[in-house]
């Protein structure tokens, strides 16, 4: 196997519902910016490399930037890291975005994170608990979310307004072989989408309001929003990341989700430059100068 300077790995098609082109383009454009800096960049699809034994038996690349998320790829990519390759995002950072890891990490480190817990999708063990949740004054609705990776199909994230709806969502997960789900309290307010690059030094940040909502435009501190978002990213060790937050009527900000390397669709051109600059800052000088 020929040793490569930089290698880009696209996201799995399954993990790009309605975003296949957008996910493809942000990685491709990032690579083009790096090529413009005189670096050799090659791209591969995860399906290409997952089935190739020869792929993993050769020398690892010096640097890989990747959007793939499945464990069948993360495990061998971790071996690349152990052999000295630089991965952006790192394998552990990507794993940290699996909700069964993310929920405990962010619940313990953040002041404003919605009450969230992992629950069994076997509703036989949930009947009394579900009834009690909605009997309590002021409780509900709740979000039911897939416990590991982010959206792969409709129903992976949905709002339940009654115990019956929670039960139906859990049963749907169980029918797909998903043993656990996340039960997360709903926070009322303006829903904001977030994008970030970097952890310290030169960083890049953008936000926008989600579509399809009755927007109240509650006032809030953009500095506080940025600080909270980057704090969460550092907790998970993410370098290229996206997320969602809610701004309440009182101006409080709750981070409700964070993920590795989103599509950056509306900011694709400037985001690709920011990501490439970040990657360049992580490349050993001996590679950058070759």
Model region roles, listed by residue range:
Residues 155-236:
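Phosphate-binding site of ATP-dependent enzymes
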């Amino acid at each position: 196997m020929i040793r490569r300077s930089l290698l880009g790995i696209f996201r799995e098609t399954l993990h790009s519902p309605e975003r296949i082109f957008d996910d493809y383009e942000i990685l491709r454009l990032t690579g083009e910016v790096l090529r413009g800096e005189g670096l050799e960049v090659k791209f591969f699809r995860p399906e290409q490399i997952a089935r190739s034994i020869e792929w993993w038996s050769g020398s690892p690349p010096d640097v890989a930037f990747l959007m793939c998320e499945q464990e069948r790829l993360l495990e061998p990519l971790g071996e690349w890291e152990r052999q000295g390759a630089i991965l952006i995002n790192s394998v552990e950072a990507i794993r940290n975005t699996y909700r069964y890891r993310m929920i405990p990490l962010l619940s313990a480190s953040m002041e404003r994170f919605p009450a969230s817990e992992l629950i069994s999708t076997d509703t036989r063990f949930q009947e009394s608990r579900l009834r009690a949740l909605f009997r309590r004054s002021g409780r509900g609705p709740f979000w039911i979310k897939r416990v590991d990776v982010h959206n792969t199909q409709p129903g992976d994230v949905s709002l339940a307004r009654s115990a019956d709806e929670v039960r139906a969502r859990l049963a749907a997960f169980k029918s797909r072989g998903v043993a656990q789900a996340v039960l997360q309290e709903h926070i009322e307010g303006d829903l904001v989408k977030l994008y970030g690059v970097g952890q310290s030094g030169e960083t890049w940040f953008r936000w926008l309001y989600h579509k399809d909502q009755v927007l109240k435009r509650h006032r809030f501190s953009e500095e506080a929003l940025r600080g909270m978002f980057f704090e969460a990213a550092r907790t998970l060790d993410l370098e290229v990341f996206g997320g969602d937050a809610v701004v309440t009527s009182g101006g409080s900000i709750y981070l409700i989700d964070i993920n590795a390397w989103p599509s950056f669709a509306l900011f694709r051109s400037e985001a690709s430059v920011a990501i490439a600059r970040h990657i360049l800052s992580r490349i050993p000088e001996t590679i950058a100068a070759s």
